[in-house]
């Protein structure tokens, strides 16, 4: 098998989305998990104008657009059907059917009064949705719903199952369910904490498995490692932390790597690193990669090891401005990227690169980088099993 590092270095642009009437930042990307042999896979893109665009993955044509929803955060396909979800600052998580052109949400998951949702995820079996709120008064909540469709109850609005309120003290910026265990979920916050929960427990205190401290405002979290027993996060000031949950019940340190500012330590061939975008765990090779970029649109891919981060390759000639989102497909080794130049790009290894005209960057103020805060220095806190 070709080394994954060589595959990344071999990525070239296959397709570029056509220009839209209203250029927007592309803030989030996800692909449908269902097999669609006739129509091909679908791609959902969250845009900065409060819309979600559904693209055909092979041609990147816009099939339909769900418009008019300012305050959306994140975009995610269900794992077993073509429903698309996004959380909203209006206190709901919205669900659309990507196959329907009506544009109206088919389901609304309502929060508690004054909830402002800024993060969410759906469990691997599509049974539970969890959303994180901004801090209002003294509360930052993780709110849960039953996402299953009940033939006895066909109402389109769902009330919460309950909420966790004791474990974060500030905006909950990230929520990520375990890729295969629907009971495990990790959350990250501007309070610097990354909390791991087992939601099969009876209450919040028992559900909290461990608390890790990134010492800064969390911008991205993910699962990695064999059986996904590791977690990692990035921070709004470009830090990176990586923890091994296998060591919770041992004397081994839980922290695999802690880099306060990746920009200062990474040795990038031919240039610099301006920011981190997210992480990519390659299950087949059991390798974790960190994805970052430059303000001129170059994408940097870095290999993550306990000894540090090593620059693997740079993807150039695609974007003309900051890259805000990406989605890696393990099945065909393809990469989708979106940025502040309003472009959606499809990259594949060894593809014939085509010549395109770079679009100028649109300068829209980003609120996410105004949330940087520095916190106490305890890198993690173990919870003793009773």
Curated annotation (Swiss-Prot):
Which segments does the entry list as coiled coil? none
Q: Which Gene3D superfamilies match?
A: YVTN repeat-like/Quinoprotein amine dehydrogenase (2.130.10.10)
Start and stop residues of the WD repeats = 21-65, 68-106, 111-155, 167-207, 213-253, 318-357
This protein's superkingdom? Answer: Eukaryota
Repeat listed as a keyword: yes
Q: What PANTHER family does the record point to?
A: WD REPEAT-CONTAINING PROTEIN 89 (PTHR22889:SF0)
What's the protein here called? WD repeat-containing protein 89
Q: Which organism is it from?
A: Bos taurus (Bovine)
Lineage, broadest ranks = Eukaryota, Metazoa, Chordata, Craniata, Vertebrata
């Amino acid at each position: 098998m070709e080394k994954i590092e060589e595959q990344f270095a071999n990525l070239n642009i296959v397709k570029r989305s056509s220009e839209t009437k209203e250029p927007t930042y592309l803030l989030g990307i996800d692909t449908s998990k269902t097999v669609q042999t006739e129509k091909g896979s679908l791609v959902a893109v969250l845009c900065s104008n409060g819309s979600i665009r559904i693209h055909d993955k092979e041609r990147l044509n816009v099939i339909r657009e769900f418009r008019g929803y300012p305050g959306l955060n994140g975009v995610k396909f269900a794992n077993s059907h073509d429903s698309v979800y996004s959380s909203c600052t209006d206190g709901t998580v919205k669900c659309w059917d990507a196959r329907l052109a009506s544009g109206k949400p088919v389901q609304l998951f309502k929060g508690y009064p004054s909830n402002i949702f800024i993060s969410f995820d759906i469990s691997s079996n599509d049974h539970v949705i969890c959303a994180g709120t901004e801090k209002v008064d003294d509360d930052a909540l993780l709110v849960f719903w039953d996402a299953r469709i009940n033939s006895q109850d066909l109402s389109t609005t769902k009330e919460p199952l309950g909420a966790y309120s004791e474990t974060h003290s500030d905006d909950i910026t990230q929520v990520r369910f375990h890729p295969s265990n629907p009971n495990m979920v990790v959350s990250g916050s501007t309070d610097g904490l990354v909390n791991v929960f087992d939601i099969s427990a009876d209450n919040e205190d028992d559900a909290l498995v461990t608390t890790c401290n990134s010492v800064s405002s969390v911008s991205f979290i993910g699962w990695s490692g064999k059986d996904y027993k590791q977690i990692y996060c990035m921070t709004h000031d470009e830090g990176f932390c990586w923890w091994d949950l296998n060591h919770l019940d041992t004397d081994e340190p839980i922290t695999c790597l802690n880099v306060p500012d990746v920009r200062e330590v990474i040795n990038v061939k031919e240039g610099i690193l301006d920011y981190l975008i997210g992480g990519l765990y390659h299950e087949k090779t059991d390798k974790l990669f960190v994805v970052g970029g430059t303000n001129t649109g170059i994408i940097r891919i870095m290999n993550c090891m306990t000894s540090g981060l090593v620059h693997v390759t740079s993807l150039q000639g695609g974007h003309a401005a900051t890259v805000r989102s990406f989605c890696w497909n393990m099945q065909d080794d393809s990469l989708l990227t979106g940025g502040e130049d309003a472009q959606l790009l499809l990259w594949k290894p060894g593809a014939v690169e085509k010549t395109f005209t770079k679009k100028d960057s649109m300068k829209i103020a980003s609120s996410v980088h105004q949330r940087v805060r520095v916190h106490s220095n305890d890198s993690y806190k173990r919870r003793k099993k009773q």
